[in-house]
């Protein structure tokens, strides 16, 4: 991997700005969706795994005449590995890539993404706060939000009722702890939730607790990694350690496994703290749980209504593209134009305010499964109404590391034993912090 230096970053970003100049010079009318005037810009390559983009790409081609070669080269880290290889090789990179919010800083700071700041004036009014903040780094915009993942509390009402717990009244983590004890009392195999050590979940929960363990200077040269002394990190780890110590969490069932979804159906995994994109996953992979589940707002340490994000992606133009105009037209269409409605109709959770506030979205009571069938998964609840409020509650001041992809990749190496009872969370966090600091220094950052 290429080491980062301020000089290299400056050169890379200068190139990105120059490329953006060529975008403006092309003079295409992206708002009207007119085809690009440059004869050579007839086809763009897009790497993405979001299924609703298939129809969006077809509609975009029909409207603009620009062909889209849409490729799924793997989800999240699998795509990023291929992207890194192509960037390092100097060839083979796409024109547009789906980049999750946590990965934006890592690619922006190395100059791999096109700076589209001057194309997006006023866009903050279009998007919800969390996603809009997440496509920015050091005051610049590097992508357009595609979806969002405000955290929400999904729960099996049937199990909670059996345990005598009203999930709607759980506002604090102390109340959640009390509920965890009551649910586990139903049987040794009943747990309020599961966690085998998930870096994204850890980030979301510490964010929810007000943590700010990672900071990057405006020029991208200095990074602060302060997990061990951050109050928000301590608040969450103290809470979670208590549940681990008392055996109130399922630490054996891996997330996204067949057994995980089975647990949601039979009630042995009674709830989830996860992103608002979860309904379709439940309808498809835990189909027999239909009618049993509901969703409510996240409980917090102090009972406040603040919230955090879990997941969510952007579409970003690669700085190396020679088809910047067409590439930008596509992300504009998909995430700021007609493609937004197409994606929401296909089941995507929106990142824009208009979709989130529309009656048709808020009044939805069914979830579309993979066969396109409407499933009454949440027992008639207007679940999007809850999720839209969750999005409004997101605090947008959390920062990811400029090497967040690496940080999440090695999370389990240092904290895995914390979930098996072989060490405390604090021990794993201290070791992870040192590894992150050492890695940052090795990449050329000044680390504090």
What are these regions (language model features)?
Residues 93-95, 124-159, 191, 304-307, ...:
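A structural signal for short loop-to-beta-strand junctions that line the ligand-binding cleft
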Residues 1-43, 427, 437-448:
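Short, low-complexity disordered leader/linker segments with a strong preference
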Residues 59-129, 162-164, 261-271, 426:
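Extracytoplasmic "Venus flytrap"/periplasmic binding protein-like
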Residues 101-151, 205-207, 292-296, 376, ...:
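Hinge/lid segment of periplasmic solute-binding proteins
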Residues 180, 222-253, 298:
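Glycine-centered hinge/linker elements that transmit conformational signals in sensory
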Residues 278-289, 303-409, 447:
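C-terminal lobe and pocket-closing loops
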Residues 161, 245, 386-448:
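Conserved C-terminal helix/tail region of periplasmic/extracytoplasmic solute-binding proteins
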Residues 38-51, 66-71, 95-96, 142:
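Short, well-ordered beta-strand elements
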